[in-house]
């Protein structure tokens, strides 16, 4: 698809931080940074109704603590990311099945990250991490495609594609779970190595309208890696291994899309929406698939 766009983006991305080594086992740190991101080509080609996509800007504030002593280490990190014109997925797909993003004027991501690791023996280690977060858009307005009772697109009186706006307010950001956790148990003994990785992801919304019928359910999935390393004449070493994904055969969806429509009274060729058009109901549709 040809594009006739001539835009220049000039960014200043400062970073600053402090680090305090309390002693050999305890450390504190704090940081501030600014990050900018220009729109991608898809952001331009997928932009059917709104103004041209804008670059996004993030102000990132973080503070944390780490502890390390012998066989054990742990840490905690608190963060607040303040966005201007963040490009977020809106749950829709373009004509070739890629996710569509839109600018939202004000939004934020804030949370706490916890991590810990322990070397239980010389050959066995366990690492875990978890993130609790709150990811929100402020003052969000949803744009719904207008259709008639035959589910055909409706048009304005000047034959532009018609849309209905719906003010949502503060709403969760799509594809942004409130809680995630990972566990990794790893073993390395006399050439044999194995690891069990488990991931938990809480519920996610497929769009930014906070609709319970457009969500991905929470899921927990584990993968097992097994390997063995040995020497072979003429070679330094040989490694053979196998990976079993979804070890416990869990059924889950990790991705999907959603679309919404405003259904107005009208049939057949009557596809013009005017001030007298009667809104019958709004409809949401969600579909799911694995990554």
Where are each of the predicted segments found?
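Signature of Gram-negative outer-membrane beta-barrel scaffolds
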Residues: 1-23, 142
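Conserved C-terminal beta-signal and adjacent last beta-strands/turns
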Residues: 30, 125, 162, 170-291
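Outer-membrane beta-barrel proteins
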Residues: 1, 27, 37-43, 74, ...
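Structural signature of outer-membrane beta-barrel channels/translocons
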Residues: 11, 19-25, 56, 66-70, ...
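Solvent-exposed loop segments that connect transmembrane elements
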Residues: 1-6, 42-48, 88-100, 139-169, ...
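Short sequence motifs at beta-strands and strand-loop junctions characteristic
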Residues: 4-12, 53-57, 104-108, 173-178, ...
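Membrane-embedded beta-barrel scaffold of Gram-negative outer-membrane proteins
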Residues: 21, 27-33, 54-110, 115-119, ...
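Gram-negative outer-membrane beta-barrel transporters
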Residues: 80-82, 102-208
């Amino acid at each position: 698809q040809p594009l006739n766009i001539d835009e220049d983006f000039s960014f200043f991305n400062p970073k600053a931080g402090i680090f305090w080594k309390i002693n050999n086992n305890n450390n504190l740190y704090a940081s501030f940074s600014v990050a900018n991101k220009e729109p991608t080509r898809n952001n331009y080609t997928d932009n059917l109704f709104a103004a041209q996509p804008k670059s996004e800007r993030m102000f990132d504030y973080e503070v944390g603590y780490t502890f390390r002593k012998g066989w054990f280490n742990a840490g905690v990190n608190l963060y607040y990311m303040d966005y201007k014109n963040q490009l977020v997925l809106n749950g829709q797909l373009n004509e070739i099945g890629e996710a569509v993003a839109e600018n939202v004027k004000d939004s934020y991501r804030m949370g706490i990250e916890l991590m810990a690791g322990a070397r239980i023996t010389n050959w066995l280690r366990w690492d875990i991490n978890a993130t609790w977060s709150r990811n929100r858009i402020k003052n969000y307005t949803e744009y719904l495609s207008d259709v008639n009772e035959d589910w055909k697109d409706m048009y304005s009186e000047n034959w532009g594609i018609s849309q209905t706006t719906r003010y949502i307010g503060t709403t969760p950001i799509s594809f942004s779970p409130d809680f995630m956790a990972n566990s990794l148990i790893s073993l390395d003994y006399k050439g044999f190595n194995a690891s069990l990785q488990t991931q938990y992801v809480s519920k996610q919304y497929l769009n930014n309208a906070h609709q319970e019928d457009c969500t991905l359910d929470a899921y927990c999935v584990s993968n097992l890696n097994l390997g063995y390393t040995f020497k072979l004449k003429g070679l330094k070493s040989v490694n053979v291994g196998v990976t079993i994904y979804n070890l416990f055969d869990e059924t889950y969806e990790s991705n999907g899309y959603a679309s919404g429509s405003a259904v107005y009274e009208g049939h057949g060729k009557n596809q013009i929406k005017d001030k007298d058009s009667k809104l019958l109901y709004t409809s949401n549709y969600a579909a799911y698939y694995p990554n």
